[in-house]
Amino acid sequence: MTLCYLIFDASDDGADTGSWEAMASVRAADLPAVLAEVQQVLTAAARHSPGPRGALDEGGAWDADQQVQTDGDWTTVTLTLTGPWAWGEALMERFTLAE
């Protein structure tokens, strides 16, 4: 799958848990495309999940947080995934960046 807006940065906590965060700031005309990319990532994450979704400290195997904030003509969408490092890295390999 090709992503045009979301570029993920990964961080590892050293205990085999990682987080992957992407942020896109767009004008209203591009917001539907960004939200569609977010949905693609969430669908893939759920389809290939390592277990139940939920807060890791409450027994979940993975989780996601989506934030949308509008400031004037711009809307910023942030997506953060957390879960096992191997799962997240394999998930990220499913996506390619548009050139």
PLM regions: where:
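Amphipathic protein-protein interaction modules
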Residues: A36-A86
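Amphipathic alpha-helical interaction segments
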Residues: D13, A28, T70, E93-T96
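Intrinsic disorder/low-structure terminal segments
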Residues: C4-I7, L81, R94
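Long, contiguous N-terminal structural blocks used for assembly/anchoring
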Residues: M1-G51, E58
